[in-house]
């Protein structure tokens, strides 16, 4: 863990985690742009912040170090030798070109680092910048659109833009255009923040990759096995490229499992339907399996000729095999009632955050799932969630673990 990163499981004692406190980016959501910004409703920011603060305190009460993305990004920007390069990349990926790009960049350069990061995250409205004469057709035709830079309201889901695997990281190419710029902040922090920049950090998969990969689909089962969901947001080709990278550069990784889940918004990532809660216990949304309990899973392993891929259907058996245990316990999200199960999964009942073996943080609203976890011997910390859940993500979604203790 010389470079400050260490994740060898989903359940090792959580030591350091990265979060983003919901901010003014949420107040730049309007009904007209809900769909493009990936929201179903407009959250109430003041309550959302109270809920997030409660969540953070719950972690801190368990002696977890909580780092804030916005703070680290501003500190990293202070260390960066050329702020204009970072801004240019951010503006280009916001589809601003020609004079507009220069105009926006010059405006943002007038702020200190904290305010600049805040504006990049919250979005830059056209009304914030003094009026100028428009020279180009595209500018004139786009006059009604309110933003130079779109807000990033999904940024409080720090799980997805990047994921630590071992002592390296994937800096992810996000599937949805509304989220593409998010991983630029992670890239900035790892390159320029003093906490990370002094050591070499392997990048297993970079944001320039051709196929999307998101952290909600990346689960670290143990130091030898990574489980990746092939989902609405992660492409099978990205999983294959990640496996090739890990096998060539991360000697402890022996296999990558690819689990195929339905490509729907409600199951957008693997961690919305399946999370690890203890050594051989998982919570699962029953609807991702067929009536026989089967799910397509592919075992990717290194071979003399490149990759060897073995298709399987017995998902539960495969998980037990790679963990080296006789069997595993799958705890159904919402229980056996299909109505309760669907409702609680929609509100992230399966999206648990393990902070130690057999100890998790969950949303309080999913009382059936929480009761089932407790009956299975899991210690459950419930956090308030009426507004946080509107973004369609739970406690695991809202965290990027930086370090965990290794399992014995």
Swiss-Prot record:
Entries under InterPro entries matching the protein: Arg_deiminase
GO molecular-function term, one example from the UniProt record: arginine deiminase activity
Record's keyword annotation contains Membrane: no
Pfam family, one: ADI
Catalytic activities: L-arginine + H2O = L-citrulline + NH4(+)
One Gene Ontology cellular component: cytoplasm
GO biological process assignments: arginine catabolic process to ornithine; arginine deiminase pathway
Keyword Hydrolase recorded: yes
Top EC class for this record: hydrolase
UniProt xrefs under NCBIfam families: arcA, PRK01388.1
Stated name of the protein: Arginine deiminase
Native organism: Listeria innocua serovar 6a (strain ATCC BAA-680 / CLIP 11262)
């Amino acid at each position: 863990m010389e470079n400050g990163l260490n994740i060898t499981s989903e359940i090792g004692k959580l030591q350091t985690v990265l979060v983003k406190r919901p901010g003014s980016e949420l107040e730049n959501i309007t009904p007209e742009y809900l769909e493009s910004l990936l929201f179903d409703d407009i959250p109430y920011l003041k309550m959302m912040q109270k809920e997030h603060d409660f969540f953070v305190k719950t972690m801190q009460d368990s002696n977890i170090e909580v780092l804030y993305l916005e703070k680290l990004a501003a500190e990293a920007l202070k260390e960066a030798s050329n702020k204009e390069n970072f801004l240019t990349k951010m503006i280009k990926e916001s589809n601003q070109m020609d004079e507009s790009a220069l105009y926006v960049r010059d405006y943002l350069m007038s702020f200190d680092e904290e305010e600049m990061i805040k504006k990049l995250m919250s979005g830059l409205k056209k009304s914030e910048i003094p009026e100028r004469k428009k020279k180009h057709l595209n500018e004139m035709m786009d006059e009604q659109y309110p933003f130079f830079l779109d807000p990033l309201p999904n940024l409080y889901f720090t799980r997805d833009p990047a994921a630590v695997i071992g002592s390296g990281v994937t800096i992810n190419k996000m599937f949805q255009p509304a989220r593409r710029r998010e991983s630029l902040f992670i890239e900035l922090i790892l390159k320029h923040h003093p906490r990370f920049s002094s050591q070499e950090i392997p990048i297993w998969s970079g944001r320039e990759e051709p196929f999307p990969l998101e952290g909600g689909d990346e689960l670290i089962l143990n130091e030898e096995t990574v489980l990746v969901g092939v989902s609405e947001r992660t492409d099978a080709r990205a999983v294959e490229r990640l496996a090739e990278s890990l096998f060539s550069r991360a000697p402890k990784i022996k296999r990558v499992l690819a689990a195929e889940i339905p490509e729907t918004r409600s199951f957008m990532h693997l961690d919305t339907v399946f999370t690890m809660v203890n050594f051989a216990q998982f919570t699962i949304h029953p609807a991702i399996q067929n009536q026989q309990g089967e799910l397509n899973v592919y075992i990717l392993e290194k071979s003399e000729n490149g990759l060897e891929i073995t298709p399987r259907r017995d998902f539960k058996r495969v998980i037990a095999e790679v963990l080296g245990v006789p069997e595993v316990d799958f705890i159904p999200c919402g229980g056996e009632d299909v109505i309760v199960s669907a409702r609680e999964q929609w509100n992230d009942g399966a999206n648990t955050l393990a902070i130690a073996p057999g100890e998790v943080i969950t949303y309080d609203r999913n009382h059936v799932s929480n009761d089932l976890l407790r009956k299975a011997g899991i210690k459950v910390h419930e956090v308030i969630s009426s507004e946080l859940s509107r973004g369609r993500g739970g406690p695991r979604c809202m965290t990027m673990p930086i370090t965990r203790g290794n399992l014995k």
